[in-house]
């Protein structure tokens, strides 16, 4: 089974994250990317 994505790492879907939560965050460049909470 695939391992879960840790907090702060880019993610496609909530289910991919260890926290089961993937939300849009703004990075240092001002771009918005989905990362695990």
Curated annotation (Swiss-Prot):
Any GO BP: defense response
Site (Critical for insecticidal activity): 10, 27, 35
Any GO CC annotation of this UniProt entry: extracellular region
Reported effect, residue 9 to A: 4-fold decrease in toxicity to crickets, and insignificant decrease to flies. 16-fold decrease in binding affinity to cockroach membranes
Xref: SUPFAM superfamilies: omega toxin-like
GO molecular function, one term: calcium channel inhibitor activity
Compartments where found: Secreted
Cysteine-cysteine disulfides: 4-18, 11-22, 17-36
Lineage: superkingdom: Eukaryota
Annotated keywords: Calcium channel impairing toxin, Disulfide bond, Ion channel impairing toxin, Knottin, Neurotoxin, Secreted, Toxin, Voltage-gated calcium channel impairing toxin
Tissue: Expressed by the venom gland.
Biotechnology: Spear and Spear T (Vesparon) are biological insecticides containing 20% of the active ingredient GS-omega/kappa-Hxtx-Hv1a. They are effective against thrips, whiteflies, and spider mites in greenhouse settings. They have a large molecular weight, are hydrophilic, and have many hydrogen donors. They kill some insects on contact. The peptides block two ion channels in the insect nervous system (a voltage-gated calcium channel (Cav) and a calcium-activated potassium channel (KCa)).
Miscellaneous note of the record: When expressed in tobacco plants, the toxin induces a 100% mortality of insect larvae H.armigera and S.littoralis after ingestion.
UniProt note: domains: The presence of a 'disulfide through disulfide knot' structurally defines this protein as a knottin.
Entry similarity comment: Belongs to the neurotoxin 08 (Shiva) family. 01 (omega toxin) subfamily.
Function of the protein: Reversibly and voltage-independently blocks both mid-low- (M-LVA) and high-voltage-activated (HVA) calcium channels in cockroach DUM neurons. Is lethal to many insect species but not toxic to mammals. May target the insect high-voltage-activated calcium channel Dmca1D. Also inhibits acarines calcium channels. An extremely high toxin concentration partially inhibits Cav1.2/CACNA1C, Cav2.1/CACNA1A and Cav2.2/CACNA1B calcium channel of rats.
Name of the protein in question: Omega-hexatoxin-Hv1a
Organism, as annotated: Hadronyche versuta
């Amino acid at each position: 089974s695939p391992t879960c994505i840790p907090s702060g790492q880019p993610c496609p879907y909530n289910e991919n994250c260890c926290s089961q939560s993937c939300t849009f965050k703004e990075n240092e460049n001002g771009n918005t990317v989905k990362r695990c909470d």
